[in-house]
Swiss-Prot record:
Cofactor: binding details: Binds between the large and small subunits.
Physiological role: Catalyzes the deamination of various vicinal amino-alcohols to oxo compounds. Allows this organism to utilize ethanolamine as the sole source of nitrogen and carbon in the presence of external vitamin B12.
Designated name of the protein: Ethanolamine ammonia-lyase small subunit
GO CC annotation: ethanolamine ammonia-lyase complex; ethanolamine degradation polyhedral organelle
Catalytic activity: ethanolamine = acetaldehyde + NH4(+)
Disulfide bridges in this chain: none
The organism of origin for this protein: Clostridium perfringens (strain 13 / Type A)
Cofactor list: adenosylcob(III)alamin
Matches recorded under HAMAP family: EutC
Location(s) in or outside the cell: Bacterial microcompartment
InterPro entries, per database record: EutC (IPR009246), EutC_C (IPR042251), EutC_N (IPR042255)
Subunit structure of this chain's protein: The basic unit is a heterodimer which dimerizes to form tetramers. The heterotetramers trimerize; 6 large subunits form a core ring with 6 small subunits projecting outwards.
Length: 295
């Protein structure tokens, strides 16, 4: 039987099947399905799988030692015990991976809201980047300010303060909105115990870490502390870092900075980090050094 004969046979079978179908029954079923589709169940919802704590989620079928497996998972956010469906990941594992990746992408390409900036009384400024694409592809522009912006910084901030705090969106706007409101009161309270006051706080859009050097030069601050969003990953999109330097200058070595990283609810909490930052700032002022010079 050649291809032409096979095609003819299939066409005949399809024609016979169509002829046996009751079209009235088909129309009735279609109307019923359409009617049901238009009805929305108000009490139904799609659960957010990103809210599941993967440290407590074991997807291996019939594990030999469930308790030991969960004990191991509790010590790491790694995706252990994800199970298999044949040779592949289970659907929930694949969906969670895509959801976490999407959250990471969103945190990079979204902006800190204007309402958040106004609510916290930040002084908004911007580096020389014009948009997110340029920020990602031109790191050098995220380190510098225009002459006009530099003048705004000089005008709005205290002159020659002991401490200048600044907030930068960095690579995660989600990290800033999730942590800043908890960490700032902790820093301010800690510094107050040492007799240090915090002046106006800058918010820098399209901020790279060395932008703090330009702020240090513009304000003449003894210590500059930058709270900035870290590059997100699949574990969390809300991790923030604090970069602190004594008398930072443009072009200074990276080794002169002290950094506290992994500030988020699953790492170092914002309140705990704030207390540590205040202590570090006091140490820098006493020893007139930062980074490896503190060692």
């Amino acid at each position: 039987m050649n291809e032409k004969d096979l095609k003819l046979m299939v066409e005949q079978l399809v024609s016979q099947m169509v002829g046996q179908v009751d079209m009235q029954s088909v129309e009735k079923v279609v109307k019923e399905v359409s009617k049901n589709q238009s009805q929305v169940e108000s009490d139904e919802f799609i659960p957010d799988i990103t809210e599941i704590d993967i440290k407590k989620q074991l997807l291996v079928d019939n594990p030999a030692d469930r308790e030991a497996y969960l004990e191991m998972k509790a010590k790491t956010p790694a995706r252990l015990g994800s199970g298999r469906a044949g040779a592949r990941y289970k659907t929930i594992t694949a969906l969670r991976m895509r959801a976490d990746h999407a959250a990471a992408q969103d945190s990079v390409f979204s902006d800190v809201s204007e309402e958040f900036i106004k609510k916290n009384n930040f002084i908004p400024v911007k580096t020389m980047c014009t948009d997110k694409d340029e920020y990602v592809t031109r790191p050098d522009l995220g380190r510098r300010f225009s002459p006009e912006t530099t003048e705004i910084i000089k005008e709005k901030c205290d002159k020659n303060p002991k401490v200048q705090i600044m907030v930068g969106d960095g690579l995660s706007s989600a990290a800033i909105e999730a942590n800043v409101e908890d960490i700032l009161p902790s820093i301010e309270q800690g510094l107050k115990m040492y007799g240090l006051n915090v002046g106006p706080i800058l918010f820098v859009k399209y901020c790279r870490v060395p932008a703090m050097d330009a702020v240090g030069e513009a304000t003449g601050a003894d210590v500059v502390c930058l709270l900035v969003g870290e590059r997100p990953g699949l574990v969390t999109a809300e991790s923030m870092s604090a970069y602190i330097a004594y008398k930072p200058k443009v072009g200074m070595p990276e080794a002169k900075r002290t950094v506290i990283s992994n500030i988020h609810k699953g790492g170092t909490t914002a309140v705990e980090a704030g207390a540590h930052i205040a202590e570090l700032i006091k140490t820098m002022l006493d020893k007139k050094a930062s980074g490896i010079d503190l060692k």
